[in-house]
Structure formats: C-alpha cells, structure tokens
C-alpha cells in the first residue's frame, strides 16, 4: 500500500475519457510534468488496466457511455487491488451538486475541462504530487 506522501513515488497516470482529444491534451500536460501516462476510452478498460498495474493518479471523466466515472470510482474504492490511486474527476459541468457527489464518492479532487496546465499542476500538488514542469515544457 502507498503510505505517506506521493511526492517521492513514481508518477504514473491513467487518463479515462471517451474523448480522444481530451486524452491527447491531458497526456501532453502530464508528460511535461514527468508522468508516465496510459489512457483508456471507457471504464471497463480502465478497470482492467488498473488490475494490471495501478497508477498513482487517475484522471476520470464522469460522463462516459456504458460505465460512468462514478461506477469506475466505486469499484476502485471497493477493490483490494493494493495501492489507492489519487483520483481527479474531470468534468465540463460547473455543477456544485455533481462535484460534491464525486468528492463524496471518493474522488480526491476535481478538475474542469478543457484542461489548463497551471490548474492541473495545482490540483496535482493538492493531492500530494510535487509537480515541476520538465525543461521541454
């Protein structure tokens, strides 16, 4: 199990979103912050990837077909898979009720789409990652 701060842990990210454009933008930002990145276009694929290798952080869209982000998060939080990843719920909705629901469901933080690099850095820092942009950023 991951203990203490994630500031010294290997930084691995899983982006879960049904939009290829959103996954591409998030990947570019995370890679400039020295994350090793994988992505999934749906919840079932994301859960299978987590069973293989649990990332340290998951960017999770909550509006996806077949299995929404809430169900993915519920299954992750009930799973005995080992390390508990930090989960940032991603949304285009500025709905306080939906954001509160995500946080009550076990999300560590939320982030609005479209992604802003500085905001993503701040959110990652809030959940325990020391993020410094690489020189190529």
Whereabouts are the PLM-identified features?
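Short hydrophobic/Thr-rich beta-strand motif most characteristic of the beta2 strand and flanking loop
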Residues: 34-41, 49
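Charged docking surfaces used in two-component/phosphorelay signaling
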Residues: 24-32
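C-terminal output helix
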Residues: 97, 115-124
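Receiver (REC) domain active-site loop signature in two-component systems and cognate sites
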Residues: 64
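Active-site beta3 strand of CheY-like receiver
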Residues: 53-59
